[in-house]
Amino acid sequence: MKLLGLLSGLVVVATALPQADFDLQSSLLTDPTKVAGTTFDYIIAGGGLTGLTVAARLTENPNITVLVIERGFYESNIGPIIENLNHYGDIFGTSVDQAFETIPLAIHNRTEIVRSGKGLGGSTLVNGGSWTRPHKAQVDSWESVFGMEGWNWDSLLPYMKKIEAARAPNAEQIAAGHYYDPSCHGTDGIVHVGPRDTGESFSPMIKSLMKNANNSGIPVQKDLGCGVPHGISMILNDVHEDQTRSDAAREWLLPNYQRSNLKILTGQMVGKVLFDTTTTTPKAVGVNFGTHAKVNFDVHARHEVLLASGSAVSPQILEHSGVGLKAVLDNVGVEQLVDLPVGLNLQDQTTTTVRSNINSIGAGQGQAAYFATFNETFGDQAPRAHQLLNTKLEEWAKDVVSRGGFHNETALLVQYENYRDWLVNEDVSFAEIFIDTAGKLNLDLWDLIPFTRGYVHILDSDPYLRRFAYDPQFFLNELDVLGQAAASKLAREISNTGEMTQYFNGEAIPGNNLAYNATLDDWVDHVKQNFRANYHGVGTCSMMSKELGGVVDAAARVYGVESLRVIDGSIPPTQLSSHVMTVFYGMAQKVSEAILADYNATVN
């Protein structure tokens, strides 16, 4: 009966959406000459999560005109490959995946692929849909450490709740391992959030993992959206009750595309920002967009240009516009307009996998996350890890600057001391083990708090070639690789310990490739050759004080120019113990208010 009800809901959606989708498709602009030479109040470069959220918010005022320029197209209705979260990964390698390639990495001399959505909705089209929030101390540090007034947990939480249309789990889902604290969630928002449920029975393995953890004093079955993500619990997803993905285009564009003051241009990319340099401070007055060095156009902004192209692309747009480090710009022949550390401070995480075959008694659906503290991750090796934290920060900062991941050792040391405080004094979670029980016990895991820093920089003066170097410098910090190894070792241990032994039917990954009694150092050797990017890169246009290496201020305004902001995932100055969608949505709402405040001050 449960499965039948779910299927009937899916049929309703399948018959209800096509006309709206068709109307939206027909309303989108594909001819660049329709906007070339015209003027809008705001131009948004990128139609992803933050771009569409801010566009929807600004155009609530019918007097504000907005143009969104997106390289991709409307893809929300492409079918299960996007709409069904259980098809996660199937879309990779298609036209909806930007699939950025790193340079050959120093750790193993191979390139890695960084997945990122291309299309209206951005990475909300291709991600796993997980819905958690970071630790309070992490967001608080944006204000207390990095000088961003108004950026703390208490100020950001209302914005994160505002966008939610959250559903509490039902009794069966709670019995399987869900927990929901209504005080931490909003119910009147736009983004649908709730339990993922295929209609199948739930695996007993989640509760067995919880029982083992509880016996060790680790919290279980908690709401991971309340500011202290720690322990094991099933998690919410951005998904409708009928299990359709709640992506940004479906929620922020589909209801609003008919607004006469909102225009969406697809199939085009923003190459650079246009500046009026006749004033004392350069002022953004539009963008150059197109597809080719010989086929590009200008469009003008009456008030502001807003960059929302993501942590890999927004810094490239700035550099092509003359905003960045002189050495980088000189290398490609771009005249420097403003000196800022654009493209530095890149922080992404690394993922490895531990996978076990299971007996039939473990069968069933289920996804959960284990957010493990520093000491839980390292176990009896914690003293070794603490020794690194207590003795190596200055050396690490020097190494990062020498490799081009940051520009100032003293400023980077502030970041490192902040991270040490999180891990030692605040018990901020250091690793996440993501648990999936569908047909197996699959544990994907990552070190949440990397100390390494990388960069993204342009390699050509032509923005439409999109030639750039993306180097996250994975595992060039000894604590990063040790932490990844420790989390992997922990994942293997929890797969076949206590109550979990009854389900265990042999290990598939790493299996025979790594001895079962492998030491932590053996795991270090293993993870160096067996990892991928986690696709959570942040920091390349960091929001922090200029003295600490910031590119934008607390209102997301680019330092040293007027009428230009960066509003996407490149601005968080730190990594977070969370899946990042919730924070990006909250940021978009908060920055929208700053934009509107400046607009109202101008027109009034």
Swiss-Prot record:
Any idea which residues are catalytic in this one?
Answer: 536
**Chief localization class?**
secreted
Q: Which UniProt keywords apply?
A: Cell wall, Cytoplasm, Disulfide bond, Extracellular matrix, FAD, Flavoprotein, Glycoprotein, Oxidoreductase, Secreted, Signal, Virulence
Which residues are involved in binding O2? Answer: 557-558
Q: What induces it?
A: Expression is negatively controlled by decreasing oxygen levels. Expression is highest at pH 7.0 and decreases by 68, 83, and 89% at pH 9.0, 5.0, and 4.0, respectively.
Give the residue range of the signal peptide: 1-16
Chemical reaction(s) catalysed:
beta-D-glucose + O2 = D-glucono-1,5-lactone + H2O2
Family affiliation: Belongs to the GMC oxidoreductase family.
Protein purpose: Glucose oxidase catalyzes the oxidation of beta-D-glucose to D-glucono-delta-lactone and hydrogen peroxide in the presence of molecular oxygen. D-glucono-delta-lactone is sequentially hydrolyzed by lactonase to D-gluconic acid, and the resulting hydrogen peroxide is hydrolyzed by catalase to oxygen and water. Acts as a key factor contributing to fungal disease of apple. The production of gluconic acid leads to host tissue acidification that enhances the expression of pectolytic enzymes and the establishment of conditions for necrotrophic development of P.expansum.
- Name of the molecule in the record: Glucose oxidase 2
Which species expresses this protein natively? Penicillium expansum
- Phylogenetic classification of the source organism: Eukaryota, Fungi, Dikarya, Ascomycota, Pezizomycotina
Gene of this entry? gox1
